[in-house]
UniProtKB/Swiss-Prot annotation:
Listed InterPro entries: Chromosome_partition/occlusion, Cro/C1-type_HTH, HTH_ParB/Spo0J, ParB/RepB/Spo0J, ParB/Sulfiredoxin_dom, ParB/Sulfiredoxin_sf
Cited function: Involved in chromosome partition. Localize to both poles of the predivisional cell following completion of DNA replication. Binds to the DNA origin of replication.
GO MF: DNA binding
GO BP terms in the entry: chromosome segregation; positive regulation of sporulation resulting in formation of a cellular spore
The protein's name: Probable chromosome-partitioning protein ParB
Lineage, top ranks: Bacteria, Pseudomonadati, Spirochaetota, Spirochaetia, Spirochaetales
Source species of the chain: Borreliella burgdorferi (strain ATCC 35210 / DSM 4680 / CIP 102532 / B31)
Amino acid sequence: MDGVFKMIDIHLLDIDNDQPRKSVSLVELEELSISIKENGILQPLIVCKANDRYKIIVGERRFRAAKLIQLTNIPVIEVDIKESCKDFMPLVENIQRENFTPVEEAYAYKNIMNKYSLTQKDLSEKIGKSRTYISNLVRILDLEQEILNAIHRKEISFGHAKVILSLKDRQDRYNLYLIILKKKFSVRDAEKYVKNFSKSIVKKRELEQDPFLNNIKEFLFDKIQTKIDIKGNQNKGKIEIEYFTAGDLKRIVSLFGHSS
C-alpha cells in the first residue's frame, strides 16, 4: 500500500470504532509495550487523514501499547484509502493477529474474497501470504462438517486435513479421518497410508480396466489356488505368486513339474 511516512503526535490518533474487533487482552498489550520500549515500533501504523486528525486503519494494538508506556510520537504511513475499502485492512490484521484455528481463518479469507470480489492471487498479494497457502486453507472447507469440527477442536491438524484432501472420494476421506483418530496417526503416518492406498487403487483400476489381465489372474488362481498379483499391462509387467507355508511352496512348484 503506497503512502507517506511521518512521525506524528500520538494524541492526534483516533481508533476507528467501526472496525470489527475482538477484545485485546491486557497481557498481550503489556508484552507488546515491553517490546516497543526496547526496540521501538518496527512497523509503522497505517492511518488516513480525518479533518485535522488521523484515523487508525491498521495498528490499533501498537497504538494502545505505545500509550501504555506514554510514547509521545509514533511512526505512521498516511494513505489515501477509498471509503469502501476502509474495513479491509483491519479485517486482515485481525485475522493475522488473533489465534484463529485453520477453519476460522479459512472462513475469514473466504468471506473477504467474496465481499471484495478478490481472487486468491489478489488476496495473497494484499496480505503477504502465498496463493498456495490460501488455496490449501480455503480448500479444507470442502471437508465434511465433522472433520472441520475436529480441526477446530485441534483433534487433527491442518497438515492432517491437507492429506485427507489428497483423496478424491469423500468416503475414502472420511475413512482416513476415522483411522487418524483411532490410530493416532501423525501427518507422516497419514501420508504413508495415502501412498499405499493410492497404489492399491491404481492396481485395482488397472485390472478392472484390462479384462485380459483380469481373466489371466482368475485363470491362474483357479490353477494354483493361491493369491496372484499381476502388475503392469499386456506388453510388460510381472506376475507375483504368494505362498504361506513350506508345504504351500512345494505344492505350487510341483504344478510346474518340479519335484523335491
